[in-house]
Amino acid sequence: MNPRRKKRLTLAVALIGGVAAIASLLLYALNSNLNLFYTPSEIVNGKTDTGVKPEAGQRIRVGGMVTVGSMVRDPNSLHVQFAVHDSLGGEILVTYDDLLPDLFREGQGIVAQGVLGEDGKLAATEVLAKHDENYMPPEVAEAMGQKHEKLDYSQQKSATQ
């Protein structure tokens, strides 16, 4: 192999190696910032289609309804703990160390983003409350709508009369 061809080959291999290293670092950075959405049932039982459960230490988003009577506030700090449930019966505890949104209340739909702990609790870094009676995050609406059955009040009322 002549020196010119050897130099080109070395340059090509170095260029391909550099591109591969940059792509690897980029994918690693994207993977660590990836937030997957789960319902409480999916955290407890795994995703319905794949059975995959989130791992401890993973950043996730959880959506559902705040369980009535589950909120516990620390009187000496901003620390609050509450449970979030969904229509499938799954429930997860969420801890949060900041001011809750003004519209946050028990029985309200929320989305919490944070890190799943070894104990199964979500250490939330952000809590979003729904802002009016018609709004629900698309992921929560889809998950809750799978088991939601619409009632026809006109038929129900005529049956009782």
Swiss-Prot record:
It is found in: Cell inner membrane. Residues 1-8 are cytoplasmic. It comes from the Bacteria. The keyword Cell membrane applies. GO terms for cellular component: plasma membrane. Coiled coil: none annotated. Gene3D superfamilies: Nucleic acid-binding proteins. One of its GO terms (molecular function) is heme binding. GO terms for biological process: cytochrome complex assembly. Belongs to the CcmE/CycJ family. Heme chaperone required for the biogenesis of c-type cytochromes. Transiently binds heme delivered by CcmC and transfers the heme to apo-cytochromes in a process facilitated by CcmF and CcmH. This is Cytochrome c-type biogenesis protein CcmE. It comes from Shewanella oneidensis (strain ATCC 700550 / JCM 31522 / CIP 106686 / LMG 19005 / NCIMB 14063 / MR-1).
